[in-house]
């Protein structure tokens, strides 16, 4: 009975999804095989993704929520139910069920490297002193568990370590595919391909304000708000987002917007710009307001209430729900010009900056010094321009004064 169960589990990981009552592709006769140009390779199949070296300080729900947000950043959206987080004494990892073509999975390491360089991955997601590990299949889990935590977990669907009685495909998984080297221009071409997946048309934060979305009584589910910009960030939310991952995003994005030109964080909107909404009751609104206020009160220098606005916009949907759908909008107004450059830090002493479509931080001491040097250099250039303008005006006034004095000294004798 154990042998049959293990065989069924093993076949589930290595074969594509098959409807009940229908033969699998391996059982089809050779003459009925699909042609080479039928596009079968492009059809997404179910795979298991291993994500290792997660931060054990977070609970399982928090890690699942943060991991889902990270995979969405890597253009690999998954549902919360498809993420299984396992906490071990020496390694906390997750098993994620994804439906994607092989080419997408093959490019994941390079997408991850690019996202790490652009500060798109939350630093707190990874265990201290380690790097985030992404690999396909359960073989990597088996080897890593032997290296990090001793014997493999009991719930692993892999075969027993004993010798295999034969080359039966029910007990042998195919080896992990070798990841091909990225193309030379993947850095720019990859980002261009990701951006092409979004709807055309970009609207800035000011354009959305001009359309009176702030004063509008409702939004319609499925409406298009444009694409993410330097001062506009979308989050899908949903599930336990408000109670788990939202506070981390408040720290990162509010601090980054304060240190740049302001901006807005919209929760309940997909990365593509389509409105979906999140389930948010009046009690959730009160808790969210208290959470935002408590976090921003710890910022340095102090952030006053008039520096930000928290709005809950109702979402009209065709389906009836017991809890209303809303879009949460946290807007950070453009910081007022100060006599000297100010750099805001969170209640945890971290500093973030807003880049085009990404967040940089937490900044190191050297990066903060470079930021201050650039800000002071920019302020010095502005002051030098003002001095040049005032000097030119002074010379013009002195020239006009000399001309008037020359005219007043001349006299006519009759």
Curated annotation (Swiss-Prot):
Gene3D superfamilies in UniProt: Schlafen, AAA domain
GO molecular function: ATP binding
InterPro entries registered for this protein in UniProt: Schlafen, Schlafen_AlbA_2_dom, Schlafen_AlbA_2_dom_sf
Pro residues bias (residue ranges): 154-185
Pfam families noted in UniProt: SLFN_AlbA_2 (PF04326)
Region Disordered, annotated ranges: 141-203
Residues reported to bind ATP: 268-275
The keyword Nucleotide-binding appears for this protein: yes
Similarity annotation: Belongs to the Schlafen family. Subgroup I subfamily.
Protein name per Swiss-Prot or TrEMBL: Schlafen-like protein 1
Organism this protein belongs to: Rattus norvegicus (Rat)
The gene coding this protein: Slfnl1
């Amino acid at each position: 009975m154990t042998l049959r169960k293990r065989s069924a589990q093993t076949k589930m990981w290595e074969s594509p999804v098959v409807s009940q009552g229908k033969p699998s592709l391996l059982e089809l006769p050779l003459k009925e095989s699909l042609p080479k140009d039928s596009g079968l390779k492009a059809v997404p199949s179910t795979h298991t993704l291993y994500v290792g070296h997660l931060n054990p300080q977070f609970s399982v729900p928090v890690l699942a929520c943060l991991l889902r947000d990270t995979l969405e950043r890597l253009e690999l959206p998954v549902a919360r139910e498809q993420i299984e987080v396992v906490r071990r004494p020496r390694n906390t990892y997750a098993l994620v069920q994804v439906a994607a073509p092989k080419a997408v999975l093959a490019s994941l390491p390079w997408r991850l490297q690019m996202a790490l360089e652009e500060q798109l991955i939350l630093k707190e997601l990874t265990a201290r002193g380690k790097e985030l590990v992404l690999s396909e299949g359960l073989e990597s889990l088996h080897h890593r568990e032997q290296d990090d935590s001793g014997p493999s977990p009991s719930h692993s669907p892999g075969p027993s370590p004993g010798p295999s009685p034969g080359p039966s495909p029910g007990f042998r998984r195919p080896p992990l595919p070798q990841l091909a080297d990225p193309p030379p221009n993947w850095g720019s071409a990859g980002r261009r391909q990701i951006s092409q997946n979004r709807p055309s048309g970009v609207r800035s934060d000011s354009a959305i304000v001009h359309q009176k979305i702030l004063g509008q009584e409702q939004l319609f589910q499925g409406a298009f708000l444009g694409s993410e910009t330097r001062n506009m960030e979308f989050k899908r939310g949903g599930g336990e987002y408000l109670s788990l991952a939202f506070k981390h995003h408040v720290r990162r994005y509010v601090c980054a917007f304060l240190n740049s030109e302001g901006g807005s964080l919209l929760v309940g909107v997909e990365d593509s710009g389509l409105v979906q909404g999140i389930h948010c009751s009046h009690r959730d609104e009160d808790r969210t307001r208290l959470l935002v206020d408590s976090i921003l009160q710890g910022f340095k220098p102090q952030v006053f209430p008039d520096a930000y606005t928290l709005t809950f916009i109702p979402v009209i949907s065709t389906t009836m729900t017991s809890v209303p759908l809303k879009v949460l909008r946290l807007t950070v107004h453009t910081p007022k010009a100060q006599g000297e450059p100010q750099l805001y830090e969170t209640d945890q002493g971290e500093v973030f900056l807003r880049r085009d479509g990404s967040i940089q931080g937490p900044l190191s001491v050297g990066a903060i010094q470079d930021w201050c040097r650039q800000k002071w250099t920019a302020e010095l250039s502005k002051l030098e321009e003002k001095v040049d303008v005032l000097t030119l005006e002074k010379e013009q006034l002195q020239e006009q004064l000399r001309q008037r004095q020359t005219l007043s000294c001349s006299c006519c004798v009759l």
